[in-house]
């Protein structure tokens, strides 16, 4: 299949299922699987997946400078368990003992290996997933599966160097680790922004306030005689082609590295980092610089998404990423996040109301990002029933060299209470297609990169996906909630049919996520706690999948709310449980028994389902 070729799904031509009368907004469950008809499963606020804990640039947003807690359950405890007796990191590997920076007497961690090993809880059964994957375990003596790679007689760690070399060939490693030196210069404000400095100076000189726009034409005439070219040259960009690409949306918290790696294994072509905030990046915050990291298998096809409200910050971040990372395919500007805190700071969807500022930010990014192309994600508008994306896209195409535009078919105000407007997405797609056609006709611009257009919203099956990509003007579809609730959605797209995964197959997917999570966060007590927490976050979406075999009609709709149901076996029922305590039980199948002090409170509450009329 060529890049621009449209594919058709055989499933689209299949006859409709037998009509079943079901109240609007309700999922049609076969009667024998309904447990309690009058009890409706809780709905969820999926906007939190776009904002999550993000949004506090300075770290001070509440009264008294305290950082506000994001999410609807603001009292949830995010602290992870630490060991009561901690082993000094200099002693993790008995074969490679390092010098402790504090010395045995001053160090807060113990230097008594025997005391530490005696204090550890009983090892989790089985083989350490990290040792199995890469031939050694970086957690060393702290590993919760220590017995699988530790010789008690020699008191040394077991290492499989052959497996280590094989893992490198298999591209099983993480990339985009910004050096301590570069982050140190950022922290001390000593980083040399050779390109961004010129870009910022030039854009500052051209800034006009929106209120003076009426005088812009006259002012432009006066400036024609003194016009000066920009003091920088934009580098030639990598080419992007999103036609028919399987794209996973940027997602905060749940869109972490292990999840993205899982999605690549399940057929995704393009993934994005969690949204990174520009100011914390410039402040060299460790937590923020962890976000652009990726697994090697994500590249090519990996984008870093940033949020900002200032062109100077955008320029600097773009230059840092282009200079300090080697595995980034695109830089994506978030103009769709609806979270109030970001909106009040002028970031995310607030930029939809400030097109002049948005244009400046994109210009700054494009001029400072080296060969990395710049893309943007927007919504239909800020207010409900007032679509502005069409006008905005026309301006972006005319004033910027944007490699791709993604449109989420909802306004900021609308959120997830109604279905995405794919008719409007198609309208905007026509604008982009006409723009590309004009460029093709113009011999001077024929060789320049075409602008890709991607739709986003409510895609939950191969039928939804093909309905979208078979629409003129739409190059591909970005999938968000659909890929969280049903991670194998791209396998359905490739097979062009529904895949009714069994409980065992779904457990295999969770097992893979668990292994990837441990490789990323580590197999010590702290890493296992993080893996468990993020697995619970993942389960807060996957439990919403309703097995096809218990539905009375197809296609399934992502916004439909089911009555309380039971599965075809006990495991399927457990995987569909809305009780977070059951989610913790599921994690224990892969991560061992959780401690009594482990608490997980779901971040998402109600609202994402369309209210029935």
Swiss-Prot record:
Residues 1-24, 40-78 are annotated as: Disordered. InterPro entries: Aldolase_TIM (IPR013785), DUS-like_FMN-bd (IPR035587), tRNA_hU_synthase_CS (IPR018517). One of its GO terms (cellular component) is cytoplasm. Residues 51-61 have a biased composition (Basic and acidic residues). The active site is at residue 337. One of its GO terms (molecular function) is RNA binding. It is found in: Cytoplasm; Nucleus. It comes from the Eukaryota. SUPFAM superfamilies: FMN-linked oxidoreductases (SSF51395). Signal peptide: none annotated. Its cofactor is FMN. Pfam families: Dus (PF01207). It is an enzyme of class 1 (oxidoreductase). Keywords: Cytoplasm, Flavoprotein, FMN, Metal-binding, mRNA processing, NAD, NADP, Nucleus, Oxidoreductase, Repeat, tRNA processing, Zinc, Zinc-finger. Catalyzes the synthesis of dihydrouridine, a modified base found in the D-loop of most tRNAs. Specifically modifies U47 in cytoplasmic tRNAs. Catalyzes the synthesis of dihydrouridine in some mRNAs, thereby affecting their translation. This is tRNA-dihydrouridine(47) synthase [NAD(P)(+)]. It comes from Scheffersomyces stipitis (strain ATCC 58785 / CBS 6054 / NBRC 10063 / NRRL Y-11545).
């Amino acid at each position: 299949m060529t890049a621009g070729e449209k594919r058709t799904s055989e499933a689209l031509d299949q006859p409709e299922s037998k009509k079943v009368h079901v109240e609007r907004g309700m999922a049609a469950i076969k009667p024998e699987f309904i447990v309690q008809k009058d009890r409706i499963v809780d709905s969820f606020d999926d906007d939190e997946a776009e904002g999550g804990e993000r949004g506090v640039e300075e770290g001070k947003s509440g009264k008294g400078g305290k950082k506000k807690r994001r999410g609807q359950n603001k009292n949830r405890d995010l602290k992870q368990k630490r060991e009561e007796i901690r082993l000094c990191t200099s002693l993790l590997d008995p074969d490679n003992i390092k010098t402790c920076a504090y010395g045995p007497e001053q160090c807060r961690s113990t230097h008594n290996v025997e005391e530490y090993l005696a204090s550890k809880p009983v090892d989790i059964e089985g083989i350490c997933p990290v040792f199995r994957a890469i031939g050694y375990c970086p957690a060393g003596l702290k590993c919760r599966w220590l017995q699988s790679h530790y010789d008690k007689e020699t008191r040394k760690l077991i290492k499989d160097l052959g497996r280590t070399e094989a893992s490198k060939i298999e591209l099983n490693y993480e990339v985009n680790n910004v050096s301590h030196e570069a982050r140190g210069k950022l922290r001390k404000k000593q980083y040399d922004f050779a390109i961004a400095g010129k870009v910022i100076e030039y854009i500052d000189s051209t800034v006009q306030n929106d209120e003076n726009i009426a005088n812009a034409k006259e002012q432009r005439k006066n400036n024609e005689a003194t016009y000066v070219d920009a003091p920088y040259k934009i580098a030639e960009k990598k080419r992007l082609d999103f036609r028919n690409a399987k794209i996973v949306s940027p997602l905060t918290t749940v869109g972490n590295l292990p999840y993205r790696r899982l999605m690549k294994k399940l057929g995704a072509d393009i993934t994005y980092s969690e949204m990174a905030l520009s100011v914390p990046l410039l402040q060299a915050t460790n937590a923020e610089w962890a976000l652009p990291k990726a697994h090697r298998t994500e590249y090519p096809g990996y984008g870093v998404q940033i949020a900002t409200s200032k062109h100077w910050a955008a320029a600097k971040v773009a230059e840092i990423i282009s200079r300090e990372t080697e595995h980034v395919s695109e830089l994506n500007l978030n103009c769709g996040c609806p979270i109030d805190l970001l909106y009040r700071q002028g970031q995310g969807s607030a930029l939809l109301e400030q097109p002049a500022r948005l244009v400046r930010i994109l210009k700054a990014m494009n001029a400072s990002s080296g060969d990395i192309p710049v893309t943007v994600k927007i919504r239909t508008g800020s207010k409900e029933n007032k679509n502005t994306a069409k006008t905005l896209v026309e301006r972006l195409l005319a004033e910027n060299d944007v490699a791709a535009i993604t449109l989420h078919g909802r306004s900021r105000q609308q959120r997830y209470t109604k279905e995405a407007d794919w008719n409007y997405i198609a309208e905007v797609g026509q604008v982009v297609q006409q723009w590309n056609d004009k460029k093709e006709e113009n011999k001077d611009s024929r060789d320049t990169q075409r602008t890709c257009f991607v739709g986003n919203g409510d895609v939950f099956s191969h039928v939804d996906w093909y309905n979208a990509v078979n629409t003129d003007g739409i190059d591909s579809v970005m999938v968000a909630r659909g890929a969280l609730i049903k991670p194998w959605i791209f396998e359905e797209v490739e097979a062009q049919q529904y895949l009714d995964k069994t409980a065992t197959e779904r457990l295999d997917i969770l097992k893979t996520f668990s292994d990837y999570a441990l490789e990323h966060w580590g197999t010590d007590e702290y890493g296992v706690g993080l893996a468990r927490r993020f697995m619970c976050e993942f389960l807060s979406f996957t439990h919403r999948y309703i097995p096809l075999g218990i539905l009375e009609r197809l296609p399934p709709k992502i916004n439909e709310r089911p009555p309380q149901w039971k599965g075809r076996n006990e495991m399927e029922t457990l995987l569909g449980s809305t009780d977070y305590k059951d989610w913790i039980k599921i994690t224990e199948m892969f991560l061992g028994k959780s401690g009594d002090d482990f608490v997980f409170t779901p971040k998402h509450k109600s609202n994402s389902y369309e209210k029935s009329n």
